[in-house]
């Protein structure tokens, strides 16, 4: 086992605080409408320019292992805030730095660290309750656009684009951000359910000019098996032909004799058919087939539940207003599924999202919800250079997360004003003893730090403006962008309640742990040996010996 280096008490805490300050000082320059960019070196390609707090935090590693422990713990604050709300990472870091700095001063002055932590926790619980009372719902597109604009560093076009996307696909809809090819931002909306599977044969194409298959009011056969024998399909093909409609077959695969016969029938005009593979693999494929069945009012024909293709009747088939199939994608528009069944299916998937532990699984489940809800919107970000494109894409993604959070829990006055008001409302809060009261004061002082940092980044005097804002009430605050005071909500400066709440809770959680740290242990750097208590004696002995030798001469 490798030798360890151990530090105790104030020595350990001082090292840890240095690490916290390095990371927080790098992150907090990005806060607010006049926050600066941070340039991140990459081992290959051009450097990345960003204003995203968590992206800056992830890049920081310090050589000193004790300082690096402090850095890593604050990095956790930014990361957790990002995971919970998708934004507010810089605010969380600023709050954590303030709580840690003031808390460690109190510990050095002889306060009990555990009581300090209890005081901080008590203040945060009360603050979160007050935040919820201040929160107002965010449902109209104007408020959504304002939240998006603020989060995208006061970029009005981004805010409007996100509001438009949400208006078209609904609050449950999937909105993705991609790198565009032009200079302008674009919004591309796909209505209905789309999945990444195209036609199994180009002979199904009935729109040569677009290279697509288009079926109007088709029946939809869903089969959880490979179909290679045409005899299994004959009864249902005859029934569809008699009904005078077209047919879309979605199965694990359609091959051999079955596929050949479908192509011949289509080319001769006997019955208009198209076949595609079912999306996904394994259990996910079964789930997605069931989603399509719910959307189209059909039944998945599966031998697992005793259903056979040969005995399929028209009532087992789903229906949709229109289906468009390209080489790589299939879109089902306006399925006739029962609205109550669709909502039930969405609720079931939401339950799975809550239970999922993997981000990848959550993302895939969220996509399924969107496909059942209102469709998919793609925001294509445009810029002049690749470096600008990457920076802008990051801002748009942050803005998108912020608007989702705003729709979920509502909004409060932005620019750090909400936390100032909350601190004012709980200023009379007391703990069980004097040390807890100090902990409460530490938390209340920290709640001013986001406003102060926004003002500092705008080049103004933080104390003067903070005192002016504290002297007022409601959503009155300071607009650092226009350098004027006013009603933040009227000026469209809004923060999602969830973002502010998450930032405060995660900052207090990690800061509380750091304040109560008494000992730090890390591996000793290679090539070094720990200081031994008798090393000074050895040096003295050698010196004495040398002196004696000189005397002899």
Curated annotation (Swiss-Prot):
InterPro entries: Chaperonin_Cpn60_CS, Cpn60/GroEL, Cpn60/GroEL/TCP-1, GroEL-like_apical_dom_sf, GROEL-like_equatorial_sf, TCP-1-like_intermed_sf. It catalyses: ATP + H2O + a folded polypeptide = ADP + phosphate + an unfolded polypeptide. It is found in: Cytoplasm. GO terms for molecular function: ATP binding; ATP-dependent protein folding chaperone; isomerase activity; unfolded protein binding. Keywords: ATP-binding, Chaperone, Cytoplasm, Isomerase, Nucleotide-binding. GO terms for biological process: protein refolding. It is an enzyme of class 5 (isomerase). The keyword Chaperone applies. One of its GO terms (cellular component) is cytoplasm. Pfam families: Cpn60_TCP1. PANTHER family: 60 KDA HEAT SHOCK PROTEIN, MITOCHONDRIAL. NCBIfam families: GroEL, PRK00013.1, PRK12849.1, PRK12850.1, PRK12851.1. Together with its co-chaperonin GroES, plays an essential role in assisting protein folding. The GroEL-GroES system forms a nano-cage that allows encapsulation of the non-native substrate proteins and provides a physical environment optimized to promote and accelerate protein folding. This is Chaperonin GroEL. It comes from Buchnera aphidicola subsp. Tuberolachnus salignus.
